[in-house]
């Protein structure tokens, strides 16, 4: 869930939906819209800095929506965030957690069994995979350093520190075993 900068709208990744709620009257929240995800679970949502675009982690996709109309979200594109690495005919990753760079041009995706994906979103209608860091475990959560140079990923067995100063060539700085499954950072 993410709140608009003015505090009047909540955007929610809700089970198999993406929901916008007007909370300008805190005693009487009103649903603006609800968009189905085609049966895919929605795990996380982030907004562009101008709050005109929403990025939704949903199944093996990052769904990108134009949210400039407060009463309607329009799907711009579905970016397949994963591939078929084992050639079994199915996608291997599951987009779970998202972070966006301060300049709004790069999206970081905790992508389940495929590790951490780095996506160029400078053109939201045509996102491109820039780089990635694999993991032997299922990556659930992401956090970003205050200066935007490091991504921290959590998985079902380790915590990773990734230098993303050059997003096309991310560098795994450290991986340490986690005591328990760390779902979110």
Identify the residue ranges that each predicted region occupies:
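Feature marking well-ordered beta-strand scaffolds used for ligand recognition
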Residues: 1-185
